[in-house]
Amino acid sequence: VKALEEDGKICGYANLRVIAGEGEVERIAVHPDFRGRGFGRKLMEQMVSSGRMQGVTDMTLEVRAGNETAIKLYASCGFQKEAVRRGYYREPVEDAVIMWNRGI
């Protein structure tokens, strides 16, 4: 787990799981008060760097289909949409977009 702090406050965190040489960004979150200031990008850069240090060459993540801000961030970090899990999320029901960055 990687956390980012500013002025002693945790402003975001992310977690990477590595299995069989592949990395999965399991969680990434930025506190609403800190959004739009590049913390999400910093966390993604840390996840990719951490993955590389662990020998990962491919990374994946899933995101709510309606979270266009996150999808744009992930795409700018080299992730591409590869699949959709229909009705994956509950409350509200929403599809999950599966994204991969192959060859990090």
What are these model-derived regions, one by one?
Residues H31-R37, A65-N67:
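Active-site acidic-Proline motif in GNAT/NAT acetyltransferases
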Residues T57-T60, R64-I71, C77, G87-I104:
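C-terminal "cap" of GNAT-fold acetyltransferases
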Residues Q46-M47, R85-Y88:
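Hydrophobic, well-ordered secondary-structure scaffolds
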Residues K81-A83:
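A secondary-structure capping/hinge motif
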Residues G38, K42, Q46, E68-K72:
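Alpha-helical macromolecular-interaction surfaces
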Residues R37-G38, V93:
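Non-catalytic, surface-exposed connector residues within folded enzymatic/regulatory domains
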Residues V1-D33, R41-Q46, S50-Q54, R102-I104:
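Acetyl-CoA-dependent GNAT
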